[in-house]
């Protein structure tokens, strides 16, 4: 049973997932928060501050014209007051209210930050809507537009908004002082805003010569030093905190404790980059968007280290290299990675306009910094961020100055430590099989109950889709659905999830999966690729799944076996939003369009189950696809119901035509 975040039951369950060291650390945090309420820390005096962390000559000129054009178009939309966050269009950006949630119409209350119930949507509104604007990543876009065009309108808008934000958000007051990841990303944005505005006459007056700015920067850094994410929460949040802290202590190293914070942040960054990443290079949260977020943050931090001539531990570069190679390995033919686990559209550093491919941009940066492998997919798009980061980051050395690393000679398809396997076939057939751990750390905050699920695409089109995430706070019914077992392409027993949820970011019992067979190369040679795995998430039962992709027939076979006592079964297949389905009995005819061409497939479903098509249902939710955080649209879900007696398997065959 899931408890609402912040309820007594939730606190008990959350406490049960902590170790003694984490409990002690959090107790110390609570005491410090109480002490700071009556005796807040004070920013020391700063004199002679100068900003020297500028872009090298030629970095802006290296931006491709089409990338610059997209950036300026985006900046002009922002200047006109238009922006969209998580499916909500705003037209008030010319003079924003920093505490207002346009989705619910609520305004977050003022008060001591640690007393604001930011998880309570009835009191605060949708906290993600409020926080996103104050990451100030739209300001880095405006600042980049100034750097490229020299048009001072962009710089003046940035300055006006920063002064407005600083005036409205005094240190330790309001919702923008409650979450470390927000402070860390905001600091990184400020570093880049100052860098990109360096040619503007008012830049120094806005930052280093401005006591208000100095006070804000110092308090952000002091907060992050005092309240790091700990123990079971040391996931992508702690990396954002460390990256922002490190960037600020390098670029804004004007305070008496800057050198110590820089060393501490770099040590934390190195430790947690390693801890959050499998040796194969995949992110341990097994939530692909967070792989992208962590990689962006790591590259941005590395840029600050190299620019400031601060020696980063060699393992930092090594982990980022492995992450980049892993990303290149798992994307489909259209450079789309898996839709595994939670996704909230979070970015580390934004200097590009709409239409820039996030994953192509990361691979382009990886090429510039580490060098591409022959098997990497081609990246044809351009972006603003890559030439800027590449101007700051030293190329990966080939002279033995880093730990020995052997990069894959051919494209990896099976990541044993992460339990992720990609089967590839002709005509752009791509199948991701999940036999890995249930998320990261004891709470597995961003995991879904999706053991043994498959995700299938052809030429980048979702055919058997992972439905996505949609929401975090405020809509518990939808949060439960999108992370449920029924909400994925796998088997549900007894109307229960494979793993047990204790809250919206808390799992109290984790299904354990193991891969038994992984032979992904067969289909590439014209034969058959094979994968088999099982999990023990259902007590007294074991679910085993076999997947075979045969190149010659363009056929994907999925065989599900359930060993154990007789139980009710639901087998779900979620179709992508572009797929039209005509279900007759246990056969579904699928059709869609790609680049103006008609495509089709047939899905033969197990006849032992009774099949129904569901689309856009709300009570309970079923038949939905979330293309991005805060957005959902109806899509067809095929659900077969029946019973498993442990004797026979359920066989599904997907045949692609043309």
Language-model region placement:
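Beta-strand-rich N-terminal accessory domains
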Residues: 14, 18, 26-30, 38, ...
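Beta-sandwich/jelly-roll carbohydrate-recognition scaffolds of carbohydrate-active enzymes
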Residues: 97, 102, 409-411, 419, ...
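Extended, charge-enriched "interface" segments that sit outside catalytic cores
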Residues: 27-121, 128-132
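CBM-like, beta-strand-rich accessory domains located in the C-terminal region of large
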Residues: 2, 184, 343, 348-355, ...
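Carbohydrate-active enzyme catalytic cores, enriched for enzymes
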Residues: 282, 286-464, 516-519
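Boundary detector for helix-to-coil junctions that initiate low-complexity/charged tails
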Residues: 1-27
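Residues that flank catalytic or metal-binding motifs in active/ligand-binding sites
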Residues: 134, 241, 417-419, 450-452, ...
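Aromatic-lined, polymer-binding surfaces characteristic
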Residues: 110-112, 119-120, 124-324, 328, ...
């Amino acid at each position: 049973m899931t408890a609402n975040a912040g309820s007594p039951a939730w606190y008990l369950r959350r406490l049960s997932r902590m170790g003694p060291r984490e409990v002690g650390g959090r107790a110390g945090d609570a005491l410090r928060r109480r002490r700071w309420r009556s005796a807040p820390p004070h920013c020391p005096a700063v004199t002679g501050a100068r900003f020297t962390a500028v872009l090298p000559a030629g970095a802006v000129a290296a931006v491709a014209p089409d990338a610059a054009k997209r950036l300026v178009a985006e900046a002009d939309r922002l200047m006109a007051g238009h922006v969209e966050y998580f499916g909500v269009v705003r037209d008030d950006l010319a003079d924003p209210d920093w505490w207002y949630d346009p989705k619910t119409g609520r305004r977050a209350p003022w008060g001591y930050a640690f007393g604001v119930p930011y998880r309570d949507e009835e009191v605060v509104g949708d906290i993600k809507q409020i926080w996103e604007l104050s990451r100030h990543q739209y300001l880095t876009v405006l600042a980049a537009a100034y750097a490229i065009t020299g048009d001072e309108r962009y710089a003046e808008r940035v300055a006006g908004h920063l002064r407005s934000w600083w005036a409205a958000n005094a240190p330790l007051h309001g919702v923008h002082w409650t979450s470390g990841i927000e402070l860390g990303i905001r600091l990184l944005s400020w570093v880049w805003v100052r860098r990109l505005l360096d040619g503007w006459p008012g830049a120094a007056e806005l930052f280093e010569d401005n006591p208000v700015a100095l006070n804000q920067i110092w308090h952000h850094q002091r907060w992050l030093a005092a309240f790091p994410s700990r123990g079971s929460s040391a996931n992508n949040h702690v990396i954002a905190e460390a990256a922002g802290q490190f960037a600020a202590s390098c670029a804004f190293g004007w305070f008496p404790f800057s050198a110590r914070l820089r060393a501490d942040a770099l040590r934390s960054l190195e430790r947690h980059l390693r801890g959050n990443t499998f040796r194969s290079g995949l992110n341990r949260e097994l939530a692909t968007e967070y792989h992208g977020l962590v990689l962006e943050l790591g590259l941005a931090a590395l840029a600050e280290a190299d620019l400031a001539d601060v020696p980063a531990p060699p393992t930092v570069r090594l982990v980022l290299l492995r992450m980049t190679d892993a990303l290149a390995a798992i994307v489909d033919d259209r450079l789309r990675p898996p839709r595994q686990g939670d996704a909230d559209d979070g970015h580390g550093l934004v200097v590009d306009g709409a239409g820039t491919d996030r994953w192509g941009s990361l691979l382009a940066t990886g090429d510039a910094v580490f060098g591409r492998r022959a098997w990497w997919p081609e990246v044809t798009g351009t972006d603003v961020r890559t030439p800027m980061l590449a101007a700051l980051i030293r190329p990966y050395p080939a002279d033995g100055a880093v730990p020995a690393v052997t990069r894959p000679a051919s494209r990896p398809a099976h990541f044993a430590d992460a339990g992720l396997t990609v089967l590839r076939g002709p005509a752009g057939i791509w199948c991701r099989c999940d036999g890995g751990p249930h998320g990261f750390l004891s709470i597995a905050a961003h995991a879904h109950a999706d053991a043994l699920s498959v995700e299938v695409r052809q030429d980048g089109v979702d055919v058997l889709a992972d439905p996505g995430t949609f929401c975090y706070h405020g809509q518990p019914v939808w949060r439960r659905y999108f992370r449920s077992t029924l909400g994925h392409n796998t088997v549900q027993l007894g109307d229960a999830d494979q793993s047990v949820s204790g809250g919206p970011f808390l799992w109290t019992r984790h299904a354990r999966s193991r891969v038994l067979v992984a032979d992904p190369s067969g289909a590439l040679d014209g034969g058959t690729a094979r994968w088999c795995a099982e999990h023990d998430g259902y007590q007294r039962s074991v679910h085993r799944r076999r997947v075979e992709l045969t190149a010659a027939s363009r056929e994907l076979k999925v065989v599900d076996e359930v060993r154990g006592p007789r139980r009710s079964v639901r087998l779900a297949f979620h179709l992508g939003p572009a797929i039209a389905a005509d279900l007759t009995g246990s056969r579904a005819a699928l059709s869609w369009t790609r680049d103006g061409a008609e495509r089709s497939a047939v899905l033969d479903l197990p006849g032992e189950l009774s099949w129904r098509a569901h689309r856009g249902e709300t009570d309970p939710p079923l038949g939905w696809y979330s293309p991005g955080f805060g957005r959902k649209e109806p899509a067809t879900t095929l659900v077969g119901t029946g019973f498993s007696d442990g004797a026979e398997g359920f066989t599904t065959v997907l045949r692609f035509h043309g």
